[in-house]
Amino acid sequence: MAINSSDKWTVIAICLILGILLAFILMFWLERFRVIIKSNAHKHDPSDKRQIWLEKYYLFVRQIYTYLVTHKVILTLIAVPVVFAISIPFIGMQTPASSHGKQTTQVSTGNWSKNAVAARLGFLACGLYVTSYFFSIKNNPFALLLISSHEKMNYVHRRLSQYAIMIGAIHGFAYIGLAAQGKRALLTARVTIIGYVILGLMVIMIVSSLPFFRRRFYEWFFVLHHMCSIGFLITIWLHHRRCVVYMKVCVAVYVFDRGCRMLRSFLNRSKFDVVLVEDDLIYMKGPRPKKSFFGLPWGAGNHMYINIPSLSYWQIHPFTIASVPSDDFIELFVAVRAGFTKRLAKKVSSKSLSDVSDINISDEKIEKNGDVGIEVMERHSLSQEDLVFESSAAKVSVLMDGPYGPVSNPYKDYSYLFLFAGGVGVSYILPIILDTIKKQSRTVHITFVWSARSSALLNIVHKSLCEAVRYTEMNINIFCHLTNSYPVEEVSSLNSQSARNYSLQYLNGRPDVNDYFKDFLHATGTQTAALASCGSDKLLRHLKSCVNTHSPSTVDLYQHYEEI
């Protein structure tokens, strides 16, 4: 069914949303070129610290924009009334004008009757739902153009979904009110009953999407979210014949995205070594994804969706890749929490050695597990560290979908980098450091602050950090804080070191973010700088507060935050 003239306002609304995003992409690339030019100039002439008045005004405006983007609640409070104000013109409806009760070919400028407005609200909600559906897919072209992850498009997806639900709810209650006033039979009509089902799906979607529910019961959120999405497709399709064309677009987008993801997953089925390092930490290592037509470029800081059939065929979970694109393998640091990760830890733990001393040095034993896809390899190594890893390594069949995220490392275009991580958040920051060092970059100085309570995790990353600082002329300062009950001095393998251009220090206690960031700002001056952080919500909120407190209005600082 083709879209006719009465759908034009909905189509205009969709085009307006996409047009705004395209304009944003254009501004993003202009900003990227500005950063590259300025960073190149600083690399060739470090003494030049001039900042013209036009740049100061631009950076002041960008600082306001950055504050809003990094504080989503405030941005949403501003966006909601603006969106509804813009939506008012789109709920008018052009209808044939009447002359003495007879329709003529003349078209009236608009019909603002209750029935017409209620109908327009329904079509507008339908159009917003289509746009929201587009921003929910993993293979999102806008994310690639913004050198970002599809997860950053989730903000657009969530806000559009909320607007669609609110406008759709107003549409539904408006028709219920109109039916109650004059046409009570409409309250039990087929179209209204389907509307009741849509309303029920809205309630389930809203409750399951609340941050508390999503974080605490992610697996339930995942199932309910997908079931409700499919339910919306079916019920809106059946609700009104004029909605069918919009739902066909959603189905096409869904089939394309799911088809690409399923194909990649089956092409990238492989065996991973899985080790339970500590009760709350899992280390995974496996071959890098195969290159194919449906494969995506791999950039530093990307993440991967994995499925372990021996645990569940229906659950996929995202994990950040701790290795760099130049490696022929991928590494994952997995924090053990409830649900999938806890079951994986239990599975691996049940297959590890019960008594390491019973292993024969000359023998290698492979124990087959009853579940398909899991082998346990037990072998003796010379060092205690290797013994723990090798003897406990379980071979697990994994389906990989990805990588997803930026196709290149945007941080290497900035002169100064401030990187901050908490716990397994290092899996996002470490590849950025290694990639910036290994590839040609415009960066001259890196400050990396990491807080972790796991000495085992510090040990795993220690070798990579040592390699990073030894083979570059770049100025690098790395501060690793052990926040456990015992001091870092008791971990003999963690030794601080320094040279002319680098410093790697292991310290006790929580880091003082304010001091580190103020020192970084002092070193940065007027040059291009970028901040990247990955950690818990509490850690990120503390860092944002620190940045807002100490950053001058004209600081040339790009900010990016990843929550784990």
UniProtKB/Swiss-Prot annotation:
SUPFAM superfamilies in the cross-refs: Ferredoxin reductase-like, C-terminal NADP-linked domain, Riboflavin synthase domain-like
Q: Which UniProt keywords apply?
A: Cell membrane, Electron transport, FAD, Flavoprotein, Glycoprotein, Heme, Ion transport, Iron, Iron transport, Membrane, Metal-binding, NADP, Oxidoreductase, Phosphoprotein, Transmembrane, Transmembrane helix, Transport
Q: What is its EC number?
A: 1.16.1.9
Question: What positions does the entry give for FAD binding?
Answer: H317, P318, F319, T320, I321, A322, S323
Q: Which cofactor does it need?
A: FAD; heme
Q: Where in the cell is it found?
A: Cell membrane
The UniProt annotation places heme 1 binding at H157, H225
Instruction: State any GO CC term.
Output: plasma membrane
Q: Which GO molecular-function terms appear in the entry?
A: ferric-chelate reductase (NADPH) activity; ferric-chelate reductase activity; flavin adenine dinucleotide binding; iron ion binding
Which residues take part in binding NAD(+)?
L419, F420, A421, G422, G423, V424, G425, V426, S427
Q: Which residues belong to any copy of the FAD-binding FR-type domain?
A: 255-410
Q: Which domain of life is it from?
A: Eukaryota
Question: Which residues are modified to Phosphoserine?
Answer: S362, S381, S383
Catalysis: reaction(s) = 2 a Fe(II)-siderophore + NADP(+) + H(+) = 2 a Fe(III)-siderophore + NADPH
Short name of one Pfam family for this protein? NAD_binding_6
Query: Which family, according to the similarity comment?
Result: Belongs to the ferric reductase (FRE) family.
What the protein does? Metalloreductase responsible for reducing extracellular iron and copper prior to import. Catalyzes the reductive uptake of Fe(3+)-salts and Fe(3+) bound to catecholate or hydroxamate siderophores. Fe(3+) is reduced to Fe(2+), which then dissociates from the siderophore and can be imported by the high-affinity Fe(2+) transport complex in the plasma membrane. Also participates in Cu(2+) reduction and Cu(+) uptake.
**What is the name of this protein?**
Ferric reductase transmembrane component 1
GN (gene name): frp1
